[in-house]
Amino acid sequence: MRTRRAPRRRSSIAVQRARGGAPAAARLRAWALAAARPGCEVTLRVVGAAEARKLNRAFRGRDYATNVLSFSYSPAQGDIVLCHPVIAREARAQGKSLAAHYAHLVVHGMLHLRGRDHRRAADARRMEREEIRLLRRLGVGDPYAIE
């Protein structure tokens, strides 16, 4: 007698793009799904610098716009906020394509929702290895490689 596996629960990724210039919603969703926990419900929001700064100040006590913020509400639910102006500026400064930098930060944010962090050096190395592995699957190069 063969045993049946439980069907894999589908993840739900909603995308809200309040800023032009960001990658298409389908691409953002695909990058998030690559790092998603089965059955998760996540909203990706692309915002401007003023909103990112306000959220960073309110939730992290840091008075500047940052590239990505992750908000986990439960093991299966969360929001990721991506600041387009900061991401675009960083991509230019690092000589990366905008799409590659967005892919990295979406995967990075999704890993935070899964409980990963980079406060300690060992945790940061583990998280970076996981990001590199997931991005490689997506056809995106190592975001930490120095060229």
Task: Describe each PLM feature range.
Residues 1-103, 111-147:
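An acidic/histidine-cluster motif and surrounding catalytic segment
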